[in-house]
Amino acid sequence: MKEILLANLDKLHTTDLGKVRLQKNLLLREENPVLWAKGFIQRSETKISHKEKNFYVFDNYIVLAINASSYTIIIGHKE
């Protein structure tokens, strides 16, 4: 799973509303949440699962949902 997502990091994106949700839900000060998400995905301690049409990237504190066909970051939240 992780290899697929890593191979397609250049396709990772979100909508304007998704950007606002990520910044709010994860308390990000990062101007570009997609850039932050790319770094999060690349961390060795993150895990990835695939359920139905989404990838779920997570560690002990954060979960990101990413559409598996469009690579759109749908939402992120703290556990």
What would you call each of these model-derived segments?
Residues M1-E79:
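Ribonuclease/tRNase effector modules and their secretory precursors
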